[in-house]
């Protein structure tokens, strides 16, 4: 899963940061202007809410990527999926999603999918397929802000699972409530679903 990467970054930040005396002598950077500040969690945002995911028919691009280019890779995958839907005259039946099927410290395998109202009639094109989204018991979390800032959300999710002694299945799903193709990255709103055993 993505969580080992987070721990690596935390350790690097702790041990590679400025020394205590250097930190005292430095002036903190000014806060970003309000228009550039990342959206904050809002009252009522889900955090560990138990839900039941229903399987949906999706058209998806399957691939792998490294974490450094994760968002850009997913945006390109969604462009391919939406292009195929347009050619087939199909309509989306919900927000786009990424299903992470394997992760490690350097990268991940994914299915970047869009739910559809009906299955495609003809061939989709190279690298695209039709399948079902995950179903069953899951925990729902909300992330607001850039994709790069998601490590803090995943850290909170890991802590929540540990505290509740819950075991996650070997995948997780992100639903993009804001369009990842057109929304400024700092304004993303993403539902994270963690299927649990």
Where are these regions (language model features)?
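A solvent-exposed interaction/effector surface
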Residues: 2-197
């Amino acid at each position: 899963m993505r969580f080992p990467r987070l721990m690596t970054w935390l350790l690097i930040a702790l041990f590679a940061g400025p020394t205590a005396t250097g930190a005292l002598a430095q002036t903190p950077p000014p806060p970003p202007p309000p228009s550039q500040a990342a959206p904050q969690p809002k009252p009522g945002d889900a955090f560990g809410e138990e839900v039941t995911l229903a399987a949906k028919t999706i058209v998806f691009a399957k691939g792998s990527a490294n974490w450094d280019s994760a968002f850009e890779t997913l945006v390109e995958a969604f462009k391919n999926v939406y292009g195929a839907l347009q050619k087939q005259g199909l309509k989306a039946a919900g927000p786009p999603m990424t299903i992470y099927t394997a992760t490690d410290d350097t990268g991940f395998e994914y299915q970047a999918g869009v739910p559809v109202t009906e299955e495609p009639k003809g061939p989709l094109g190279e690298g695209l397929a039709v399948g079902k989204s995950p179903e069953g018991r899951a925990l729902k979390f909300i992330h607001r802000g850039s994709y790069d800032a998601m490590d803090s959300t995943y850290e909170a999710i890991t802590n929540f699972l540990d505290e509740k002694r819950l075991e996650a299945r070997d995948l997780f799903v992100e639903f993009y409530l804001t369009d990842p193709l057109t929304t400024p990255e700092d304004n993303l709103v993403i539902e994270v679903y963690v299927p649990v055993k």
